[in-house]
């Protein structure tokens, strides 16, 4: 029996570029699998889109037996959509990618080749991004540097949600990595097994705008930090030590100035110290709140996603 590759695509309000993605990706996938002797399935996960994305996906499924559409009951987020796709995928190898063509389908033959070589994890690393400004490049580089410093895990610079995993890695993710607050690319980077890296150039979006605004990126960053590091919880200890040392120096300085007859203005010093301490304390409190929110989400044990329906061959739809 031929091996199968599952392509998982998260979709949220992508109607403007969805047809272009399908028309571009489908023949590349078909040719790559024919050359490698693999079968394939193309899994679209509709993450509660409010536009015509679902109608387009139903059309793809009706015309193409390889297309499967997983329709969420409500928007659950990009990572939940990828997890759902991984859960339902039946392939020996699974590739997650976005629907905006920033993740090039042309890389699929190389990914299949790596699966044939026995790799379990194929990490896709961006070497260039056409629509990324200086701010995004700097903050992205800083994020991965901070993550590698704060945690024992290893994060490749410019890694993305474009990756390939083997069937056994998918089963590990399905069984053991079911956190309600998660950082999927971090799990993939650090799950272990035989791993390799491929590079790609991220093109500009084919249409529409990115669904990742600044708020979403900040949330993703906080999730990553809190999932892979306990360093923020230790900030209070370090901040206390620094504050104690600073206070000791200030006391010595004040005593010396007093005996020299140059007593410092106590009000200004007090305002600066209080402002500094409150700033540090609120940062620490914010991180503690994030950890508590994660614990709260885990205790509630609510589902990561809820599937409304699955559309398979010839447009057949079944409710879940």
Q: Which residues are covered by each model-predicted region?
A:
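A conserved acidic beta->alpha catalytic loop
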Residues: 43-54, 101-102
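Short aromatic/hydrophobic "clamp" motif used to bind/position activated sugar donors
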Residues: 94
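Conserved donor nucleotide-binding strand/loop of the catalytic core
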Residues: 33, 40-43, 54-88
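N-proximal low-complexity "stem/linker" segments adjacent to membrane-targeting elements
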Residues: 1-27, 31, 35-38, 317
């Amino acid at each position: 029996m031929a091996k199968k590759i599952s392509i998982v695509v998260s979709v949220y309000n992508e109607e403007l570029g969805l047809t272009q993605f399908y028309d571009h990706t489908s023949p590349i996938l078909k040719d790559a699998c024919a050359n490698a002797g693999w079968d394939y399935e193309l899994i679209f996960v509709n993450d509660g889109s409010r536009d015509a994305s679902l109608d387009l996906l139903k059309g793809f499924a009706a015309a193409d037996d390889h297309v499967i559409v997983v329709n969420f009951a409500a928007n659950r987020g990009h990572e939940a959509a990828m997890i759902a796709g991984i859960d339902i995928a039946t392939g020996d190898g699974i590739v997650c990618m976005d629907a905006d063509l920033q993740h090039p389908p042309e890389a699929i033959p190389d990914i299949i080749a790596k699966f044939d070589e026995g790799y379990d994890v194929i990490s896709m690393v961006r070497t260039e991004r056409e629509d990324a400004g200086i701010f995004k490049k700097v903050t992205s580089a800083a994020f991965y540097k901070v993550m590698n410093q704060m945690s024992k895990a290893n994060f490749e610079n410019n890694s993305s949600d474009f990756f390939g995993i083997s069937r056994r890695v998918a089963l590990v993710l399905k069984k053991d990595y079911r956190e309600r607050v998660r950082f999927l690319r971090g799990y993939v980077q650090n799950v272990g097994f035989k791993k390799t890296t491929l590079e790609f150039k991220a093109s500009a979006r084919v249409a529409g705008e990115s669904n990742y605004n600044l708020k979403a990126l900040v949330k993703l960053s906080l999730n990553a930090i809190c999932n892979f590091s306990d360093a923020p919880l230790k900030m209070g200890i370090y901040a206390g030590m620094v504050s104690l040392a600073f206070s000791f120096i200030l006391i010595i300085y004040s005593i010396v100035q007093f005996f020299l007859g140059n007593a410092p203005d106590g009000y200004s010093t007090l305002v600066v110290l209080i402002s500094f301490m409150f700033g540090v304390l609120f940062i620490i409190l914010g991180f503690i709140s994030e950890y508590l929110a994660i614990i709260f989400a885990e205790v509630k044990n609510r589902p990561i996603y809820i599937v409304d329906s699955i559309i398979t061959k010839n447009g057949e739809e079944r409710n879940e």
